[in-house]
Amino acid sequence: MINEILDKVGRLLEEVRTKKPLVHSITNYITATDCANVILAVGGSPTMADYVKEVEEIASISSAVVLNMGVISEKMVEAMILAGKSANKNNVPVIFDPVGAGVANFRNKSAEKILSEVKVDIIRGNISEIKFICGLRSETKGVDASERDMNMGNDKKVIVAQELAKKLNCVVAITGVDDIISDGKRNVILSNGHKMLANVTGTGCMSSALCGAFAGASDDYFIAAICAVLTMSISGEIAYEKSKGIGMGTFHISLIDAISMMNENVIKEKARVTTINR
């Protein structure tokens, strides 16, 4: 099964460059540039429109829509719901990044409102965010996962991901030291990445943007999520080797470089994937 997954991931890396999916990303001003750049780096075409009077139209012609709660407001929630509903109506996949879910009442209610009105196809977040969405007690530390949640065993994280995937009929990606991805039936643990990724603002948001790019070129959103997370985590390893002893700025640039150069051979050489039957 692992070889089959990696074959599909490798093909998708090529297909996204051929199809050049238009990815409508309603995201936050902190990470918007990096999100746009990683979409471009893998071959997609980003649009970052968030004005309520145009989001429905843009979503309707897009290949994927990414809704990111990094900086939230009533107008942003309205725009996300309008874009999400338009995407649903036009069979466009929706990726939801519930940044900071669990940390504050308005943010929590916003996440709940979006999910009550929009059918999402991929949810990507850290373990604390995903636990909150799943209705479990979480201990979010700002927009970061709490240490207690991060120290949950992978077996428990797989259960959380799988149950939420079944509940919402979507793919769930929990990113962290190890990454858990489930569509409710298929479950994988991805064990790539480097701790330096946590020191760059927005690598989670970038991972969600990559989910949009790959989902926009595939109808298998489980594979799209795996492709996105492996691309980010393996690129983190490569970027660390290139920037070792230099500093964070070089790591950041090297990360984008590595994402832009990702291909099937690199994935098959470096990916560490474990399938979980449950």
Swiss-Prot record:
Entry keyword set: ATP-binding, Kinase, Magnesium, Metal-binding, Nucleotide-binding, Thiamine biosynthesis, Transferase
GO biological process, alphabetically ordered: thiamine biosynthetic process; thiamine diphosphate biosynthetic process
CDD domains linked: THZ_kinase
Reactions catalysed, as given in the entry: 5-(2-hydroxyethyl)-4-methylthiazole + ATP = 4-methyl-5-(2-phosphooxyethyl)-thiazole + ADP + H(+)
Entry annotated with the keyword Acetylation: no
UniProt gene name: thiM
Protein name stated in the entry: Hydroxyethylthiazole kinase
Cofactor: Mg(2+)
Keyword Transferase part of the UniProt annotation: yes
Source organism (scientific name): Clostridium botulinum (strain Alaska E43 / Type E3)
One Pfam family this sequence matches: HK
